[in-house]
Amino acid sequence: MSTGTFVVSQPLNYRGGARVEPADASGTEKAFEPATGRVIATFTCSGEKEVNLAVQNAKAAFKIWSQKSGMERCRILLEAARIIREREGEIATMECINNGKSIFEARLDINISWQCLEYYAGLAASMAGEHIQLPGGSFGYTRREPLGVCVGIGAWNYPFQITSWKSAPALACGNAMVFKPSPFTPVSALLLAEIYTEAGVPPGLFNVVQGGAATGQFLCQHPDVAKVSFTGSVPTGMKIMEMSAKGIKPVTLELGGKSPLIIFSDCDMNNAVKGALMANFLTQGQVCCNGTRVFVQKEILDKFTEEVVKQTQRIKIGDPLLEDTRMGPLINRPHLERVLGFVKVAKEQGAKVLCGGDIYVPEDPKLKDGYYMRPCVLTNCRDDMTCVKEEIFGPVMSILSFDTEAEVLERANDTTFGLAAGVFTRDIQRAHRVVAELQAGTCFINNYNVSPVELPFGGYKKSGFGRENGRVTIEYYSQLKTVCVEMGDVESAF
């Protein structure tokens, strides 16, 4: 399949083990191919009736799935992981077409996805409570039990990967899930739904409903939904938390960020430059944990900046399905204009554009209406500038200088966000000292934007709470039951 040829021809809702048209509507949406600007799908947003049908299907499947042993769930999740590996090329291609990221990156995303399923398959077979001995031969024990029907609401920057990150631990714990993708990227969640069905989950265990805010509201407020996990913006996360609170539903929120990346003068310069590029330009800069505030110690500021600009200008922009492309288009026209607007404001506030920050028009005529821009490096930045304070969510790096460790820590933490942070230094004592002081849920030392599924991922402050990945996520998709067993006579006060 090549860029500019794909059109959705099947229903984009998934319920009861099959693709279906929604039973009712709450509006329509269009999905675009960012590389060309073509409409690839016009679809109906799910209304309250469709959401209820999806939840009821999930509720019925939950009764079957939750009674399976951990080993049975393990085998099915491992089979799903195997199918993802087998279909890696097809899924990665769909991700490129609907999201715009390069095929190089998309393959990495799909690999992380099947690794996530394998990881939680292993945990499914080893979940256990504990036994506590009490006086007189009595004892207590705990049971880790599933929650029920969980809701996943995904973002558009990692469509398939986020679907996997939310569904794998949920299903491993014995839950069912109704998933709502972003209306910008409705396609790839359906592929995972079909894979789960092929692997052997009960029909209805994993359902997909398409839609926007109204559909999300129906999900969050549904009385039979036990938990909501959301990835997206802070304002939307606040609304989801408020809606879920009315039903006393636990939530996991993975929200925005404005993360600091601290480059000390004793760093390995080559690795620090590569780390800064990884921290700013993956997925066209549309990554919530990106280290977009790059603090560089003054002694190496000029050398570091020169090398970063040189490497940024070499990034190959173009057709995301070509093997040598390293940066594709942004997600859509309004977002492209928003990011360009941030660059304009940065210049007005005194920042200097060292490269990029403007529209890029590929030579291939079929890409002329795509949403491309050149990756941007800003210098002469101050902490009070809009480009330094607000999440841009595009390929825009802001370089700031600093003198001392104490100074940069204070400035790095001066934000309402706390999703991620990074430090490059050869001084291992300094590295651990600095990350201990950084107010961020995920910290990197001498690397950035790596995401092993074995490690928990999540934020501090307004970047959200709860975690995805790692063993701890089991706690967010299960509940603990305590059982107290008396082996003697009841000692009564009456």
From Swiss-Prot:
Q: Which GO terms describe its cellular component?
A: cytoplasm; cytosol
Name of the top EC class for this enzyme: oxidoreductase
Give the residues annotated as coiled coil.
none
Mention one GO molecular function: aldehyde dehydrogenase (NAD+) activity
Q: Which residues carry this modification: N6-acetyllysine?
A: K30, K298, K303, K344
Catalysed transformations (reactions)? 4-(trimethylamino)butanal + NAD(+) + H2O = 4-(trimethylamino)butanoate + NADH + 2 H(+); an aldehyde + NAD(+) + H2O = a carboxylate + NADH + 2 H(+); 4-aminobutanal + NAD(+) + H2O = 4-aminobutanoate + NADH + 2 H(+); formaldehyde + NAD(+) + H2O = formate + NADH + 2 H(+)
Q: In which pathway does it act?
A: Amine and polyamine biosynthesis; carnitine biosynthesis
Could you list this entry's UniProt keywords, alphabetically sorted: Acetylation, Cytoplasm, NAD, Oxidoreductase
Q: Name one GO biological process term.
A: aldehyde metabolic process
Name the Pfam families on file. Aldedh
Q: How does it assemble?
A: Homotetramer.
Family named by the database record: Belongs to the aldehyde dehydrogenase family.
What is the recorded name of this protein?
A: 4-trimethylaminobutyraldehyde dehydrogenase
Q: Which gene encodes it?
A: ALDH9A1
